[in-house]
Design a protein with these regions (language model features):
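Phosphate-binding/catalytic loop of phosphoryl-transfer enzymes
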Residues: 63
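Core segments of small alpha/beta cavity-forming domains
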Residues: 66-141
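Bacterial N-terminal signal peptides that target proteins for export
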Residues: 1-11
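Structured, amphipathic secondary-structure segments that form assembly/contact surfaces
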Residues: 111-114, 118-224
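C-terminal motif of bacterial Sec signal peptides marking the signal peptidase cleavage site
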Residues: 20-23
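Bacterial signal peptide processing site
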Residues: 25-28
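Hydrophobic helical h-region of N-terminal Sec-dependent signal peptides
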Residues: 13-17
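Post-signal peptide N-terminal segment of mature Sec-exported envelope proteins
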Residues: 34-60
Length: 225
């Protein structure tokens, strides 16, 4: 994980190759180098954008999937255009939910929250659990606005796939729950993170994240790139 607030930096260092979904402008080291694979597609201008849906709209349309009901102070923009390929578009859709599910676990202060475990398995699940637990210990969660862009998705014949994408955390911060204090930090090069995820389609037809690597300050994710 990257993008850690100062207080949580040391704790999150143990969450190797897991999700980086925290405050703006953190300075910690990377937990893995993202492998740039077939990917530098230009994101559309505010296409596919979305805010956190209200509770009545936030449940997945597929029966049996967990509801992702997030606090109203969290919002998301996904500049991920549909590809027209059924499986690739399913990876994009499930990846949106996997990102939000980690934030939900933080909001619920539950390192074993069912929603993120539904969308993560193996190494990715273990890393996410450690990351979430660091927030639970400090009674903190994330707040603000996240933007995702420059997505490149691939599917293999063995029901595995990959998704490489950028995250803009310039308007995302950590909030401490006891007094609702928000740790606002300046936007820097490190506010932009490149992710490389490995996914597997499980027996429920869900594309679950099995491994996630990240690179903070990636040149490819900078606003001028």
């Amino acid at each position: 994980m990257n993008r850690r607030p100062t207080l949580l930096a040391a704790l999150a260092l143990t969450a190797t190759a897991a999700l980086t979904l925290s405050a703006c402008g953190g300075s910690g080291s990377d937990e893995g180098s993202a492998k740039d694979k077939d990917s530098d597609k230009i994101a559309g201008a505010d296409t596919g954008s979305e805010k956190s849906a209200p509770p009545s709209e936030s449940a997945s349309v597929t029966e049996g999937r967990p509801k992702i009901e997030l606090p109203p102070d969290l919002s998301y923009t996904f500049d991920w255009s549909k590809t027209g390929d059924k499986e690739k578009d399913a990876i994009l859709a499930d990846s949106k939910q996997s990102i939000k599910a980690v934030h939900l676990a933080m909001a619920n202060q539950d390192a074993l929250d069912a929603a993120y475990l539904y969308y993560h398995e193996g190494e990715a699940a273990a890393g996410a659990e450690k990351f979430i637990q660091a927030y639970v210990k400090e009674e903190a969660r994330v707040t603000g606005a996240y933007r995702y862009y420059k997505a490149s998705v691939n599917v293999s014949d063995d029901n595995s796939g990959s998704l490489v994408y950028c995250e803009d955390q310039g308007k995302a911060y950590d909030m401490f729950l006891k007094d609702e204090k928000v740790n606002k930090t300046p936007v820097t090069k490190n506010s932009y993170v490149l992710y490389n995820t490995r996914l597997q389609k499980n027996d429920k037809g869900v594309w679950v994240v099995t491994k996630l690597l990240s690179q903070r300050g990636s040149d490819r994710c900078q606003p001028s790139a």
